[in-house]
Amino acid sequence: MSDKVLVIGAGPNRIGQGIEFDYCTVHAVWAIQEEGYKAIIVNNNPETVSTDYDTSDKLYFEPITLEDVLNIVEKERPIGVLTQFGGQTSVNLTVPLAERGVRVLGTDPDDVDRLEDRDRFSKLLKKLGIPQPESGTANDPEEAVEVAEDIGYPVLVRPSYVIGGRAMEIVYDEEDLRRYIEEAAKVSPEHPILIDRFIEGGIECEIDGARDEAGNVLIPGIMEHIEEAGVHSGDSACVVPPQTLPEHAQETVLEYAEDIAEGANVIGLINIQFVYDPEEDEVYVIEANPRASRTVPFISKAVGIPLAKIGTKAILGREIPEVLDEMGLEPPDGDPGIVAVKEAVFSFEKWPGVDPVLGPEMKATGEVMGIDRTFGAAYWKAQLAAGHELPLEGTAVISVADRDKPDIVPIARKLQRLGFDLLATRGTASHLREHGIECEVVRKVSEGSPNIVDLIREGEIDLIINTPTEGKDARRDGYAIRRAAVKFKVPYITTIAAAKAAVEAIELVKEKGVTVNCLHDIHKGDWTPREVKPEELTRYGG
């Protein structure tokens, strides 16, 4: 009998599929070797650890296509193929490989399809009694309008089977929807679009978990998204443990996650995304991915549990409690003893025409993390690592959409209390003054000079809070402000949730300073810090 296992890598780096999956691939290889098998990798990205000469027992530097993988399987005769660790690229090969008689290790290909296929997944959730946002599928523009009206605006629309939320958008009315169909998506029976109810003000969160054949489930923790629902999970900062998700909602998330893993007979890894609606006090399931996700490295490092390695051993027949015991690890209790923040890294300075506003279409090209004992300090460290050094003083410009004006008041008040001078565009300034917050009015780009962009160019602005607004002039103004911020390296924030987090971080660092700790010490529970003044830290670290 063969003693080889073939692992399919993630292929080239691109938005939505990056080096996080290579981390998972390498950990899978190490687990395979520890279990006494030879690990073979197929990947075609030279900028990865998985394609280093000494990572696997054999490397095939070939395209990640069905034909190439079948040729390798025919030559090597492995006991099976692992498709869970190369992101959506490798998962998409699961069913085609199984149909051609190849043994796919882990979750059965039919169960993979049950989680990937919208209709089958909806039926599974219905059977399990788990709610999901109302949704529908449209094969032509008129059907899309009907479905959206039945669900009720706003809705989230996207083509089926996408990586990184490409061509995904939140639409607020029929005119918006028709424009989306015309510009972004060709709708046909072969290429339907998916339409979901968008939960405004919802708190998104997700879990990465592993399950073995005996039914043991391991969930290291819940990652709460800092951005509001509607920002792609790959672009949103997230935090472990959750900071605003109620305790009972966290319990529901864990319960639903275990039910889905069991209901779909998952063997190996699974990622499930949820949204909590505070108004209805209801947790909804958005989607489940039967594979390693881009957050596996983050949650693994945040709680000190190598999830990809444990998931691989579960796929190879080991039981999770036994593996944890072997590694000297305790099952997580939901409190890692630290606060860890993951922040997305963007390359907007290299993309002159792209609006650096966050939305449902992924734009991040990497990620970093900050660790501390408080959320504010961890968030500040994550921003610093991502190249955004939050200012502790200076001038802040605020220009927000009408829907965000009630929420900006406490943020502006806190900035003023922290010693910032405030500038605001006319509408925002009027709202702030009504609530007793003094600020100067600054012109929008469309209102002539000197305007916000002129001040950014002259180095007079230290922080920008600018949420996207509707209307042609408003969109053009916002775009010009955000592009100027990128060009002149001024920290800019495009969501209310991120603004709240940033102000909390500024307040904490300004009042208490920040500490630097060794990662190894943190996982041993040793918090003997070196006190560091904020000014001693540079944009590139401490």
Swiss-Prot record:
Entry-linked Pfam families: CPSase_L_D2, MGS
Which intervals of the chain are annotated as region Carbamoyl phosphate synthetic domain?
A: 1-389
Cross-referenced PROSITE patterns? ATP_GRASP, CPSASE_1, CPSASE_2, MGS
Annotated metabolic or biological route of this protein: Amino-acid biosynthesis; L-arginine biosynthesis; carbamoyl phosphate from bicarbonate: step 1/1; Pyrimidine metabolism; UMP biosynthesis via de novo pathway; (S)-dihydroorotate from bicarbonate: step 1/3
**Cofactor(s) it depends on:** Mg(2+); Mn(2+)
The terms under GO molecular function for this entry are:
ATP binding; carbamoyl-phosphate synthase (ammonia) activity; carbamoyl-phosphate synthase (glutamine-hydrolyzing) activity; metal ion binding
- Region (Allosteric domain) location: 390-542
Gene Ontology BP annotations: 'de novo' UMP biosynthetic process; glutamine metabolic process; L-arginine biosynthetic process
Alphabetized UniProt keyword annotations: Amino-acid biosynthesis, Arginine biosynthesis, ATP-binding, Ligase, Magnesium, Manganese, Metal-binding, Nucleotide-binding, Pyrimidine biosynthesis, Repeat
Q: Which CDD domains match?
A: MGS_CPS_II
Binding positions (ATP):
158, 197, 199, 204, 230-233, 273, 287
Q: Which residues form the ATP-grasp domain?
A: 122-316
Q: Which GO terms describe its cellular component?
A: cytoplasm
Which sites bind Mg(2+) 2?
Answer: 287, 289
Q: Residues that bind Mn(2+) 1, according to the entry?
A: 273, 287
- Coiled-coil regions listed in the entry: none
- UniProt remark on domains: Corresponds to the C-terminal section. The large subunit is composed of 2 ATP-grasp domains that are involved in binding the 2 ATP molecules needed for carbamoyl phosphate synthesis. The N-terminal ATP-grasp domain (referred to as the carboxyphosphate synthetic component) catalyzes the ATP-dependent phosphorylation of hydrogencarbonate to carboxyphosphate and the subsequent nucleophilic attack by ammonia to form a carbamate intermediate.
Database matches in PANTHER family: CARBAMOYL-PHOSPHATE SYNTHASE [AMMONIA], MITOCHONDRIAL, CARBAMOYLTRANSFERASE FAMILY MEMBER
Give the quaternary structure: Composed of two chains; the small (or glutamine) chain promotes the hydrolysis of glutamine to ammonia, which is used by the large (or ammonia) chain to synthesize carbamoyl phosphate. Tetramer of heterodimers (alpha,beta)4.
Q: What does this protein do?
A: Large subunit of the glutamine-dependent carbamoyl phosphate synthetase (CPSase). CPSase catalyzes the formation of carbamoyl phosphate from the ammonia moiety of glutamine, carbonate, and phosphate donated by ATP, constituting the first step of 2 biosynthetic pathways, one leading to arginine and/or urea and the other to pyrimidine nucleotides.
Which family would the database say this protein is a member of? Belongs to the CarB family.
Q: Tell me what this protein is called.
A: Carbamoyl phosphate synthase large chain, C-terminal section
Q: Which organism is it from?
A: Methanopyrus kandleri (strain AV19 / DSM 6324 / JCM 9639 / NBRC 100938)
